[in-house]
């Protein structure tokens, strides 16, 4: 759009909203005299916005326009993301005050142009967005069809190049993208996101290569997964050769849609978000158990969008020994308090009657699944946390009894030996 028109739009919106916000705060101030710490402009979605993921997504763009989101929740706008930067610092401050909560925040790279990485990294560095309580994941929305229709990209390969070429360039020569080099030290994972319930064509061996994919149709979930994994695998080998940390593949999967999504992520990912559709496939569920692939589950989010809380498979997965943890998803819309993670744990404990031992084990799983450094994990759950079985459990830090860890490890080893006919090569360490 025309910059002058965009600037005018910005001035109109600010001019319209400014007095409105000031009036509300003024009225609240007159009611809550002497209680100014309680004043805020928190919002929460009405329940009618849930039930359908496509309708839920539309609420990010009121009246079909993304202007409000661009102003307040984007880093590449006319004010260079200053508002979002200040908001993020406040969240960092709250996490530091809580002391015992760490977060893995997600920011988006869309693949529309290669300069997105530098814009995002500059926003992080220029706003000094660093916290010992936070690491970052990059989420890639699966929106090729939209970009193709708009004429932004010419092929799927064009989108992949926009996502991965800057990463290869900065790995080979950090001086080529100095801000990105700094930012990537805080990036621990790559995520794929979008509505999994959308109908899609099943992938076949006759599908075109990314360079040949020039039609307007969106590739299947597994197509995205394979090519993102292939590029990330090569990138990580290069980063490891340079002494840099690997970036793990940790997509959203199994929240809805085809069960094949979970088969694709089983072959490629480090861990996944959600995975509730594993309840429909005992075979895949067993494979995820044997591989101990982490499932970061969000029952309250699922309850609002896809699956009633009492039907959530989390307690079944946990009792069977799958590597599950509790996490938050869309806390601004889903949760009702300033402690969304506490909400997840407290409601799960209450509804499913989880013991204190259960909660401690789930919290330990959460640390193991996370992308935080070896030093921090050693500080939180013990120096030998990466060892399997009781040897890797420091009861003084995890509060998980040795007998619980030993039982889990013994059953898992027996299952592995059963599958491999007594010749299983049991790894002694978990993936750090």
Model-derived regions, located:
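Metal-cofactor-binding active-site regions of metalloenzymes
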Residues: 1-432
């Amino acid at each position: 759009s025309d910059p002058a028109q965009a600037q005018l739009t910005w001035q109109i919106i600010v001019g319209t909203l400014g007095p409105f916000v000031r009036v509300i705060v003024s009225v609240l101030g007159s009611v809550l005299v002497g209680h100014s710490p309680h004043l805020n402009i928190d919002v929460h979605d009405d329940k009618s916005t849930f039930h359908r993921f496509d309708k839920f997504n539309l609420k990010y763009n009121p009246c079909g326009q993304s202007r409000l989101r661009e102003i307040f929740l984007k880093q590449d706008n006319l004010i260079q993301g200053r508002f979002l930067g200040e908001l993020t610092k406040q969240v960092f401050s709250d996490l530091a005050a809580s002391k015992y909560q760490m977060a893995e925040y997600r920011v988006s790279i869309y693949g529309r142009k290669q300069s997105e990485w530098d814009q995002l990294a500059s926003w992080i560095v220029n706003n000094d967005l660093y916290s010992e309580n936070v690491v970052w994941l990059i989420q890639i929305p699966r929106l090729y069809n939209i970009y193709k229709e708009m004429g932004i990209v010419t092929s799927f390969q064009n989108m992949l190049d926009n996502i991965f070429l800057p990463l290869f360039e900065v790995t080979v020569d950090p001086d080529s993208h100095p801000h990105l080099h700094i930012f990537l030290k805080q990036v621990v994972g790559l995520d794929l996101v979008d509505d999994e319930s959308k109908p899609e064509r099943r992938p076949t061996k006759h599908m075109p290569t990314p360079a040949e994919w020039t039609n307007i149709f969106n590739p299947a979930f597994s197509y995205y997964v394979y090519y993102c994994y292939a590029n990330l695998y090569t990138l990580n080998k290069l980063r490891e050769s340079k002494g840099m940390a690997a970036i793990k593949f940790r997509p959203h999967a199994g929240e809805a849609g085809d069960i094949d999504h979970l088969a694709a992520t089983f072959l490629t990912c480090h861990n996944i978000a959600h995975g509730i559709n594993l309840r429909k496939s005992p075979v895949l569920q067993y494979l995820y158990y044997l591989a101990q692939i982490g499932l970061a589950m969000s029952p309250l989010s699922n309850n609002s969008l896809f699956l009633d809380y009492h039907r959530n498979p989390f307690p079944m997965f946990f009792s069977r020994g799958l590597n599950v943890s509790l996490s938050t998803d869309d806390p601004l819309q889903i949760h009702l308090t300033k402690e969304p993670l506490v909400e997840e744990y407290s409601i799960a404990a209450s509804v499913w009657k989880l013991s204190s031992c259960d909660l401690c084990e789930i919290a330990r799983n959460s640390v193991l699944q996370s992308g935080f450094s070896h030093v921090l994990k050693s500080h939180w759950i013990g120096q030998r946390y990466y060892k399997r079985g009781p040897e890797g459990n420091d009861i003084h830090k995890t509060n998980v009894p040795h007998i619980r860890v030993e039982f889990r490890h013994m059953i898992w080893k027996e299952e592995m030996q059963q599958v491999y006919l007594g010749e299983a090569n049991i790894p002694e360490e978990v993936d750090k």
